[in-house]
C-alpha cells in the first residue's frame, strides 16, 4: 500500500496543474494494429510517466523538500482580542440593587497577550478568572460602574510563511498578508481592529531547514536530461519546469508543483512570481486519498478482468476498457476487429472534458482528427452506438470526477472566525459575537434589599426604625383621642348644640352641665 501511495503523484500532478482531475486518458498517438493472442494482454503500469527516448539512467544526488513541507511553511500562532466588561449598579431607596453588564473592545498590548497565552497553555487559573464578569460594587442611592479587562486567546491560528519573501499569509490579516515577525515587531495586525496575531514561539526563527538530500536516477538522452527517477522510484519529467529560488536555494519547480535542486545542462526560464511550490491543503489530502483508493481499485478491476479473460478464453469490449492506461505516457491500446484481438502502441494524454475527444456526433478525436471505426468499433471498449453517438464505458461512471464533485460539496474546512470571509464586524467598539462564546453570559439582574451597611449598622437602623414606628403610632392614638372627646360628650345628651338648664337639690337653677359640674359635688 505504501508504494502505491507514493507512486500516484503523476496522476495527481496533472490534476493539480490543470485545476481538476482528468476524467479520461486517450491516445494522441496510435501505432499500427497487429493481431495478438489473449496471453499477450496485460494490465498497464499506471505508476510511471515515461518520456520518449530517455532510456539512459545514471545514479545522481539531488535535494528536495522534506516530507511535510508543501506549498508554504506553517507557522502556528494565536489571536488576542481585548474585551472590557462593564458592570453598572444602582441601589434605590429601599435597597434594591440593579446590575447591568455591557461589553466593548480595547486594543491589547503584545506583552499582555503573551502573558495571557502562557497562562492558558499552562492551565493557570488566572486566565479563566480573567474572563469572569467583574464583581459589581454598589452604594445606596448611587450608580456605580465597575470595569474589568479580559484578553480572549483563540488558538490555533495557523499561517503560511512564504519561503520566497518570508512574509506571513492568512485570511485573518488585512489583505491576507503580514510583512512578518521581526525582533522589533512581535505581532501582526488583523482584520479586526481590536485583535492582534502573535506566533506561539516568542522568538521565531525563519524555519528554512526544509531540505533533504536524496539519491535517484537521472533519465537522459545524450546530453539532454528528460527527467529523473526519485528516491521512491517515481519518475518525474522536467517538461515545463522553471527555475525558482526557495529560501535562497536555486532549484526547479516541476509541472506537478514539486521542487528539486539538481544540475542540468539545459537553460530553464525563471518561474512567474505567482507560481508556488506544491499547493497543498486539507482538501488535496482528501483528493490524494481518493485517488490512491481509485488507482488501487482500478488495478484490482483490471486484474479481475484479465483473470476472467484467461479463464473463459473470451474477451469483450467492456473488459478491454479495464486495460486502458490511466496516466499520460506510453502504453498499449486494444480492440477487436472482425473477431480478431488487436494491439497497438499508444501514447496517452489527459482529457479534462468530454468535448475534447467527442467534438461532434459520431466523432472520436484522436491525434487532432476523427478516428475511423471498423464496423462501429474503435478501441479500449469505445464503440459507436445504434444512434450514431460515441459510447465510452467510463463516460457513464465519470470515474474520479465524481469524487471531485463530492469533495466540493461535502468538505467544509475548519477556520478561524476572523478568517471567515462572511464575518461582518460591528461598528465602533461594541463587542463582537465571536468573543461571546469564550465569556460568561451577561444579563440584567436585581438583588434583594441591601442597603450596603455592615451588620451592626443594619441592627441600629432596624432599632431606630422600630422606635420611630412606635412614636408614630403613639402620636396617632393621642390625636385620635383628642379629636373624638368633644364628639362623645355631645352624643351623650343627644344634643343639638343648645344649652340645657337643670335644677339642683337646693333649688338653684344651673344653666348647663358644665355649670353644674363646676359647682362642686352635687348629691342627687
Swiss-Prot record:
Iron among keywords: no
Topology, Intravirion side: 481-524
Disulfide bonds: 43-302, 54-226, 80-113, 178-188, 208-247, 242-271, 363-370
Subcellular localization: Virion membrane
Signal among keywords: yes
Signal peptide: 1-19
Pfam families: PH_Rhabdo_glycop (PF24834), Rhabdo_glycop_CD (PF24833), Rhabdo_glycop_FD (PF00974)
Glycan attachment positions: 56, 223, 338
InterPro entries in alphabetical order: PH_Rhabdo_glycop (IPR055448), Rhabdo_glycop_CD (IPR055447), Rhabdo_glycop_FD (IPR001903)
Ranges annotated as spanning the membrane: 460-480
Miscellaneous notes: Arg-352 is highly involved in rabies virus pathogenicity. Its mutation dramatically attenuates the virus.
Function comment: Attaches the virus to host cellular receptor, inducing endocytosis of the virion by using different host proteins including TFRC, GRM2 and ITGB1. In the endosome, the acidic pH induces conformational changes in the glycoprotein trimer, which trigger fusion between virus and cell membrane. There is convincing in vitro evidence that the muscular form of the nicotinic acetylcholine receptor (nAChR), the neuronal cell adhesion molecule (NCAM), and the p75 neurotrophin receptor (p75NTR) bind glycoprotein and thereby facilitate rabies virus entry into cells.
Family designation: Belongs to the lyssavirus glycoprotein family.
SUBUNIT field: Homotrimer. Interacts with matrix protein. Interacts with host TRFC. Interacts with host BST2; this interaction inhibits viral budding by tethering new virions to the cell surface. Interacts with ITGB1. Interacts with host GRM2.
UniProt name for this protein: Glycoprotein
